[in-house]
Structure formats: structure tokens, C-alpha cells
Amino acid sequence: MKILVLNSGSSSIKFKFFDNKIVKASGLVEKIGEQNSKVILKNVLNNESFERELTINNHEEGLSIVNELFKESGILADLNALDGCGHRIVHGGRNLSEHCLVDDYVLKEIDRVSIFAPLHNPAHLAGIKTMIKAAPSVANVAIFDTAFHRTMPDFAYMYALPYDFYDKHNIRRYGFHGTSHAFVSSRAASLLEKDKSELNVISAHLGNGASVCAIEKGKSVDTSMGFTPLEGLVMGTRCGDLDPAILPFISHLKGLTIEEIDTLMNKKSGVYGICGYNDFRDIEREIEQGNDKARLALDMFCYRLVKYIGSYFAVLPKTDAIIFTGGIGENDSLVRQKVCERLAHLGIELDFELNKQRISGERMINHANSKVKVLVIPTDEELEIARITEELIGKN
């Protein structure tokens, strides 16, 4: 099947084209709505690139240029030649709890729950509508970040607020990074030569946004992110878990509005708020130069991560493996070392030489004597979206 995967942002469209599960092209439309917009399409098979720089006013114009570049490259005759298009959607809300083919109801529901993800869902919706207009005969599939966590039990996803807030306003823990957690846990099963229904793993997706997921027999039973992607770990610019009483205190102290506090927690906090950097390469360079705030930021990040992983050891009946994925999880050997050292009493024994090796691809970095496997698995959310899209189209 010929599958296009779209990840539409407010001013960008990222895309990958798969032909029979093989990536043939990838690219980006950036700076939509600006005069110096740019479209890049790369032929993955021969590294040939095709580019256009021009004014792109909206997503529709951007996708039209992508179609032109597909034709110019010879990779795809036309968007109408696709078998399907998979769209990454951050939030499905309470009703869209599973990946699904797009119809009028799905469009309306994605729009309705945009209040939960105002920075993401409206852009995703624009991407779907643009694709429907550009290629009316092509099936569109909505792939929700929240869907993998639909198997969490109610006692894990509920907040201890008056029940009406859940019943009438859908306030509950949803979880995110679901596509990534699903992909790497499935790959872990292959790596360990087990069926995923027999495997219990803890997946740590560590990037500028970060979350941990407890996966029992292939299903999410708990995760660190909640109603929004702000809850949980200390992140690049997000604070993670916080005493809620701090918010009105800060509001009175600084005279900040709810919107300003929201911006503070999402964009000015995390490791960035502590030391002024959110790139871990910069943080570790600063630590080497004696920057105490950088050291504190890294220690806070790792400590919170250890607490969550440790708590999921308690949640799972048995833990077979810990998975590190995402930009930090895949590339930062120091973070992996600091986390695993603090978890040694739970049966985790890291092989320090394997951990330090700069190797891309899936690998096991635990010592042979370790009771729990430690895996580094590069995530591939686009491949997972393409797989699910193909599966749903095949069923229908």
C-alpha cells in the first residue's frame, strides 16, 4: 500500500511517504503564513532533494506544492494515487479513544476536543481537511497520541476531584506519546523474542517533552502525562508534577493571569527554568565547566524519572525490561547511567561499555547478569502511524 503520513502543525507540515512499508520520501513544509515559506522533499532511496521557496498562505497551498514535488521527483504520480493518509492527532478526548477512519463525526469531535489541545488539534484538523480537498478519493485515518492509553484502569486515569468534573467535563488523565510507547514496546517484544502479550515493560520516551509508560502484556496501564502533556516528568521547558496550590500563590505573588501562568509552566520551566538551557548537550557541557544550576537541572530530571520508573515496578506484576527512546533516551548515555544506577537495587545492572557506545539502532545495554533488560530503541512514530493506517484501511 502507498501511505502518506502527515503531522500538521500550526505553521508546518511534516510528512513521510511509505510504499509497502518502505520509506521512499520524507519532507517538510515550514513557515506557513510567512513570505519565506519553504517546502523540502527528500527521496530517501537516493538522497536527492527537491525544494521550493515561496509564500505559502495556508496548509492547502503547502500540500499542493508537496504534490507538485512528488510529481517532479517521480516518486508518486499524484496524491490521488495514495491508498491512504495517516494523520497524527495529539488528543482524541474521551470519545475518540481508538484510531479510526475519518468521517464527519470524527472531524467534529477532533474540533470539539481542541479545547484540550489548542496548540495542536486545530492544526491537525486543518491537515485532514486539506488532504480531503486535495485527494477526495483517498481514505484518511486519525491516529491519536491518547489512544494507546485507553486501556488504563479508571483508578489510574481518574483525578480525585468531584466526580462531576469527569462525568460532565471529561477531566481525567489521558496520557500522550502513545504511538511512540506502542511502537517501542512492540519492537522490544521482537528484540527479546517474546510475544508482546507475554511482556511487561516500562517505556521512557525522553525528548523535550518526556513521559514514562507502564505496559503490561502489551497494554498501557499507567503513564506519567495526564490531562495535558504538562503532568509528570521534569521536561525541557515544562515543569511536570507540581503542588497545585503553588499556582494561586504565584498568581498573587507576581500578579500573573491564568494564561501567563500556563505559559510559565509550559515554556519557561523544566530544566530550562532551572539553568537556562533545554538542550541536554548544552547542560552537560555546562556541568563540565562547573555550572551548579546545570548539575541541579540534570539531577532533578533524572530523579523524577527514577521515581516514576520505580513506581511502575510496583504497578507491574513483573518488569521484563526498561526501554529508553526519544532524542535524550536514545543518545544520552549519562542520563541512562544515572537512572539505572539509582535503580540497581531493583535488579538493573547496566553494562557501562555498551551504554557508552555511540551506535544507532536497537540495542541491549544491560550486563548479562541483569535481572531486568535495559533496551535502547529508536522510536519511529511515522512507521507506526503508517502500519495502523494500512491495517484500518485493510479492515474496511
Curated annotation (Swiss-Prot):
Enzyme class: transferase
Matching Pfam families: Acetate_kinase (PF00871)
Positions annotated to bind ATP: 14, 205-209, 279-281, 327-331
Principal cellular location given in the protein's record: cytoplasm
Site residues (Transition state stabilizer), renumbered to this chain: 177, 238
Pathway(s): Metabolic intermediate biosynthesis; acetyl-CoA biosynthesis; acetyl-CoA from acetate: step 1/2
EC assignment: 2.7.2.1
Record-level GO cellular component terms: cytoplasm
Residues that bind substrate: 88
Cofactor binding note of this UniProt entry: Mg(2+). Can also accept Mn(2+).
One GO biological process term: acetate metabolic process
Residues at the active site: 145 (proton donor/acceptor)
GO MF term list: acetate kinase activity; ATP binding; magnesium ion binding
Transmembrane portions of the chain: none
Keyword Metal-binding included in the entry's annotation: yes
Presence of the UniProt keyword Magnesium in the record: yes
Entry cofactors: Mg(2+); Mn(2+)
Keyword terms, alphabetized: ATP-binding, Cytoplasm, Kinase, Magnesium, Metal-binding, Nucleotide-binding, Transferase
Annotated InterPro entries: Ac/propionate_kinase (IPR004372), Aliphatic_acid_kin_short-chain (IPR000890), Aliphatic_acid_kinase_CS (IPR023865), ATPase_NBD (IPR043129)
Oligomer and partners: Homodimer.
Family: Belongs to the acetokinase family.
Functional note: Catalyzes the formation of acetyl phosphate from acetate and ATP. Can also catalyze the reverse reaction.
NCBIfam families, per the entry: ackA
Protein name in UniProt: Acetate kinase
Organism annotation: Campylobacter jejuni subsp. jejuni serotype O:23/36 (strain 81-176)
Gene name tied to this protein: ackA
